[in-house]
Structures are given as C-alpha cells and as structure tokens.
From Swiss-Prot:
Gene name of this polypeptide: rpsM
Function: Located at the top of the head of the 30S subunit, it contacts several helices of the 16S rRNA. In the 70S ribosome it contacts the 23S rRNA (bridge B1a) and protein L5 of the 50S subunit (bridge B1b), connecting the 2 subunits; these bridges are implicated in subunit movement. Contacts the tRNAs in the A and P-sites.
Name of the protein: Small ribosomal subunit protein uS13
Highest taxon in the source lineage: Bacteria
Taxon lineage: Bacteria, Pseudomonadati, Pseudomonadota, Gammaproteobacteria, Pseudomonadales
PANTHER family (UniProt xref): 30S RIBOSOMAL PROTEIN S13/40S RIBOSOMAL PROTEIN S18 (PTHR10871), SMALL RIBOSOMAL SUBUNIT PROTEIN US13M (PTHR10871:SF1)
Length: 118
C-alpha cells in the first residue's frame, strides 16, 4: 500500500479512486492531480513507479488535506460561534444552518425526539 498525505492508499484500485481515500480530495481534485502529474487515471496504484507516486505526493501536498483541513473547518465554525452570528447560534444549538425548515424534518441535525414532559 502506498502512503500519501498520511493515508494508506489501496493498491488494487484505479489512481483516481485511490486518491479519494484522502480527506479533502474528491473525484474532481483527483482527476486534476492525475492530469497535472501526467499519471494515467485508469492505472492501478500497484502498477505505478516510485517516481510517479512521489509526483502524486508532491501534488497532493499543494492542497489542504486531512488534519489541516479538519482543523481549518472546525476553526471556521468556532469563529462563527464566537461572533454570535445567526449561523454560529445555529451551530451551537445543533440546528440546520442553511435555512431549512425545522417544524418538521431536520431529525438528523436535531437528534432523537425528546419525550414531552407532563
């Protein structure tokens, strides 16, 4: 298994699919990485040479991925909460942030129903 950005990449999958195992790299970004490095997207990781894997590592390093990306997202949410803006309050209360209705639905975000006390 090749190791890129601290993640073990599966050997038996195509390069584009394998790169998506890295947090922060989706299909489009993976295709862009393959195009920039000149690596065949349909080639399997086990068939790539060490030089090609090094090229992939260098290209992935240009993007914010894994722990840095998670930290960045959490810091942005924390900033909204500290500002006390509407979006921050919604995050703090665990409610939908982007204007969805909450009278019905929104169960995933709100969690399980709380029993009505009498």
């Amino acid at each position: 298994m090749a190791r890129i950005a601290g993640v073990n990449i599966p050997d038996n999958k195509h390069t584009v699919i394998s790169l998506t195992y890295i947090y922060g790299v989706g299909r489009t970004t993976a295709q862009k990485i393959c195009a920039d490095t000149g690596v065949n997207p349909a080639a399997k990781i086990k068939d790539l040479s060490d030089e090609q894997i090094e090229l992939l590592r260098g290209e992935v390093a240009k993007f914010t991925t894994e722990g840095d990306l998670r930290r960045e997202i959490n810091m942005k949410i924390k900033r909204l909460m500290d500002l006390g803006c509407y979006r921050g309050l919604r995050h703090r209360r665990g409610l939908p942030v982007r204007g969805q209705r909450t009278k019905t639905n929104a169960r995933t975000r709100k969690g399980p129903r709380k029993p009505i006390r009498k």
